[in-house]
Amino acid sequence: MNTLHIFDSVKKEKVEFKPIQEGKVKIYVCGPTVYDDSHLGHARSAIAFDLLHRVLKVNDYEVTMTKNFTDIDDKIIKKMYETNKTLENITNQYINAYKADMKALNILDNTIEPKATENLEVMKEMISNLISKDVAYKTSDSVYFDTSKDNLYGTLSHKSNDENSQARVEENQEKRNSADFALWKFEKANDVSFDAPFGKGRPGWHIECSAMIEKHLAYKDSPYQIDIHAGGADLLFPHHENEAAQTRCSSGQNLAKYWMHNGFVNINGEKMSKSLGNSFFLKDVLKSYSGEVIRFYLMSTHYRADLSFNEEDLIASKKRLDKIYRLKKRVYGIEDSSVNKKFKEDILNALNDDINTSIALSVIDEMINSANDKLDSNPKDKNLKKELISNINFIEEVLGIGGNDAYAYFQFGINESTKEKIESLILKRNEAKKTKDFQTADKLRDELSSMDISLMDTVNGTVWEKL
């Protein structure tokens, strides 16, 4: 196995990744709260840790990738009453929409996708355990976690108790400490609630993830329950800090050996989020750009750095991706052989250095430029073509781009009825050329050109692409 280095949020530095169990990796990524459609911020987090998943697999690790769905939350309940829909109708709608978006981005399937509402019993058990240890206590409105009972509280986010207190928004005069947070919210009018030994209500946000990790992933004989816990930088505090505290005090284990966080997507200098009302829904961006172009754009900046959304950069990313597919067209129909050793090493060296996609994509740019020069000099070199298609297949394996049909890629955004019209005009043009009616053939080409369709006459027939 190659040596992978990742940036650990606790140590605030790059460290060598060493799994808890040899050859196996357990990862938990905080998934969406399913009350609305996904935006580019969700896409960025998904792509960042999909890249981690792919790099680990290429390094021969067996990966258990888990991403949850928060399907019980204040925002979901608010949506219920706004739309007069059931909780299940809303959450299923947005879970399905999220999965469709992830498919468009070529995100590898998760091993486990737990829902909060399907794991209530383990949440109740954890809360009961914390109450029995006097680490949690009841007030009139909730069961709270007592942050003063955890000496390590704040060590993940590197915040002092004063900073933690100022950052909290849960104000209740019955709380022992201003930083204490709700584990279980007691039933209110027009609320969704579940029976529990400590009172009818519903779980707080933080306990959900701790409980799902405990149930589905946790090593029992290790100081750490899982290898990597990941999510957006906005989750570092309070969400991940609170998760870590709950698990420490409940099980005596550390939640994760490593913590990883991706940067924001910013709009006009502010983090993109639904609550701020400045988010670009992924489904809307997908109307103009393929998921593959969006993927390329979002991984062109290192995952830890903030990214300022700019459509000009999105267009530039498409042009770079176009070059991969133009090369793929030049080696179309060739069987692969083996990846160029130096190319593979250069890509892996970049990605094993904390998933450095910027360098990896630069290596690809250089390979494409060199390949085109070689093909220009010797267009019939089959061994070269076999190596190049192997290189492109490796790019898809480790970066998730370049795996689609080269001709279909350049036809993105054309609906079926328009495709039928284009194919019909091409057939008419071909017939006109056969009968040497070049005037008609030229008129048909001009008509297609007015539709922003470019034609290329090849030995295998006429192919077209959208300009």
Swiss-Prot record:
GO terms for molecular function: ATP binding; cysteine-tRNA ligase activity; zinc ion binding. Belongs to the class-I aminoacyl-tRNA synthetase family. Keywords: Aminoacyl-tRNA synthetase, ATP-binding, Cytoplasm, Ligase, Metal-binding, Nucleotide-binding, Protein biosynthesis, Zinc. ATP binds at K274. A motif ('HIGH' region) lies at residues 32-42. The lineage of its organism: Bacteria, Pseudomonadati, Campylobacterota, Epsilonproteobacteria, Campylobacterales. CDD domains: CysRS_core. Monomer. A motif ('KMSKS' region) lies at residues 271-275. This is Cysteine--tRNA ligase. Its main location: cytoplasm. It is an enzyme of class 6 (ligase). One of its GO terms (cellular component) is cytosol. Gene3D superfamilies: Cysteine-tRNA ligase, C-terminal anti-codon recognition domain, HUPs.
